[in-house]
A protein has these predicted regions:
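TPR/TPR-like (Sel1-like) alpha-helical repeat modules
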Residues: 73-90
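Classic N-terminal secretory signal peptides
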Residues: 1-22
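TPR/TPR-like alpha-solenoid helical repeat scaffolds
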Residues: 91-116
Length: 119
């Protein structure tokens, strides 16, 4: 089963302006808000959606992105680990690529580890 995902994983550079035409009311994954740099709005939307769909990997990955960008590294790592604890889901990226939720979470964790090691 593939999920269509409208998200930005900042640590992987997956941001594209291709979805900028969507209205804010359909930005349930926080993609548009993250892409616009409005991390407060993104976090509010994602947290609200996670109350309904707590296990959706695209929401966990996007919230982890918000946490990472706002300096909450331990919270971001916990969400990436939570994605890895669930079955892998094929995700359509805004670029058109299809990537496993596990691959995205693993790459983000590896990148965080590299950043910590170089500090």
């Amino acid at each position: 089963m593939r999920k269509t995902v409208l998200f930005v994983l900042a640590t992987l550079g997956a941001a594209t302006p291709a979805l900028a035409g969507q209205s804010a009311t359909t930005d349930r994954t926080g993609y548009i808000a993250i892409a616009a740099g409005d991390l407060t709005t993104a976090e509010q939307r994602i947290v609200a959606e996670r109350k309904i769909f707590p296990q959706r990997p695209e929401l966990m990955l996007n919230l982890a992105t918000v946490y990472h960008r706002t300096g909450r590294e331990s919270e971001a790592r916990a969400l990436y680990a939570a994605v890895l604890d669930r079955p892998a889901v094929a995700m359509d990226l805004p670029s058109g690529a299809v990537v496993s939720s596990h691959d995205l979470a693993s790459r983000a964790l590896a990148r965080q580890s590299q950043q910590i090691a170089t500090r």
